[in-house]
Amino acid sequence: MVKISLDNTALYADIDTTPQFEPSKTTVADILTKDALEFIVLLHRTFNSTRKQLLANRSNLQSKLDSGEYRFDFLPETEQIRNDPTWQGAIPAPGLINRSSEITGPPLRNMLVNALNAEVTTYMTDFEDSSSPTWENMIYGQVNLYDAIRNQIDFKTPRKEYRLKDDISRLPTLIVRPRGWHMVEKHLYIDDEPISASIFDFGLYFYHNAKELVKIGKGPYFYLPKMEHHMEVKLWNDIFCVAQDFIGMPRGTIRATVLIETLPAAFQMEEIIYQIREHSSGLNCGRWDYIFSTIKKLRNLPEHVLPNRDLVTMTSPFMDAYVKRLINTCHRRGVHAMGGMAAQIPIKDDPKANEAAMNKVRNDKIREMKNGHDGSWVAHPALAPICNEVFSNMGTANQIYFVPDVHVTSSDLLNTKIQDAQVTTEGIRVNLDIGLQYMEAWLRGSGCVPINHLMEDAATAEVSRCQLYQWVKHGVVLSDTGDKVTPELTAKILNEETAKLASASPLGEKNKFALAAKYFLPEVTGKIFSDFLTTLLYDEIIKPSAKPVDLSKL
């Protein structure tokens, strides 16, 4: 039996008791209460050993892929689950029946207000890839959500006043994305190890807000990222059951949409829904992370080298297969199949370019709607009307009733052949430019970064990094010059791009491009392949206090 106590628990961060966003009086002390900390410590002590074992399993699988011992296929041990037509996911929960347009963004206070005021049906509040996990971003994200759910998020800055346009019960449904299983929160140690960031984010939000959310006619809803095996989903389901039992909430009140954004998960979609069926609200196509994962898992195999990033689209064979399998699987099991992100942001000073960008969004959403998706993501409120217009053609709140007649094989999911594929010097430069810009902003505490009129998150930088690693490893020949991609070439272009970006930075000497390049260099020259950029850079952005807080005074 796990002991519910704060013994051997150390918090290396100040518990701020000063309100930061008048007129709200909410402070960090209202989030990091003794009861809330005991709750997340209980979850950590109960489930962290399982989490660590599942992460070790990921490493073991990668070793087998690298050696050629394992090739992806559907799991023989779960064939019975796939072949049983009788089981279904949960019926759509209150506030999650119509999900035709979902906006996403980090839990910054101004972004929360803007997203909740947008003409969308749901809002995915993101502690993961569009957030840089500084202590301030993570803990004040909890403060901001606490206030939003209680209609007390309105605030003023010297330049602008932010106000919700209506009662929270009539605004877009909140869905929170915690950090992935691979991340930890190093400001809170339990039994001499950092707490799982997933449990930290989920636990604080759930403990403080679950009952309030039910009161307003919604519920505690989540997006679950980066999972690579159905047993990782089972772990979430076990946590949900314990969490609901702990606060006296009926099981099944929580709902979770799982992002299918890793290659292993694409072979386990049915098992993933099955493991969380009591709490399932569907699956989502996490397109950029899926490309990243495909390269990451198959990086040692020359037949799976992908071309310039702009040539890898949702109509590429392996992407098209994964989308069609996802929609078919979700609708057969009675849950939502959500489309991917439109990352475009308005181009205010160029009407012609803006029109072209918006047409690209419209065509992308039309493709998704026709394929059978029940809704899709946008990164900016200006894109919401386009998404709404397209998905209004469903004629219903969703199209779960429509089960596309498709048969997707394991070979289809691994078909990375792309017509007219090429790698060019410009492709190298684009990857380095985007990767450096994103990493530099992330190191300064911003995880949601406008680059070339697109709102980028960590997945974009991950694609940049792993493509360059793959091109160097396999000595890809450049279409424009006939030269091989070598460590020397990528290092040379990296230095050029770093100097160019640093000299143009409005921050002057305070920019972090040199630091970003230091971490980027061994990755893009093929020397090392880190699991995630976010874990690689994490220690650069945290500032734990030297001494822990005295928790006995809470």
From Swiss-Prot:
Disruption phenotype: Diminishes the ureidoglycollate hydrolase activity by 3 to 4 fold. The keyword Transcription does not apply. Allantoin metabolism-specific malate synthase involved in the recycling the glyoxylate generated during allantoin degradation by the ureidoglycollate (UG) hydrolase reaction. The active site is at R177 (proton acceptor), D457 (proton donor). GO terms for biological process: allantoin catabolic process; glyoxylate cycle; purine nucleobase metabolic process; tricarboxylic acid cycle. This is Malate synthase 2. A motif (SKL peroxisome targeting motif) lies at residues 552-554. It is an enzyme of class 2 (transferase). Induction: Expression is insensitive to carbon catabolite repression, but highly sensitive to nitrogen catabolite repression. Its expression is induced by allophanate or oxalurate. InterPro entries: Malate_synth_C_sf, Malate_synth_sf, Malate_synthA, Malate_synthase_CS, Malate_synthase_TIM, MS_C, MS_N, MS_N_TIM-barrel_dom.
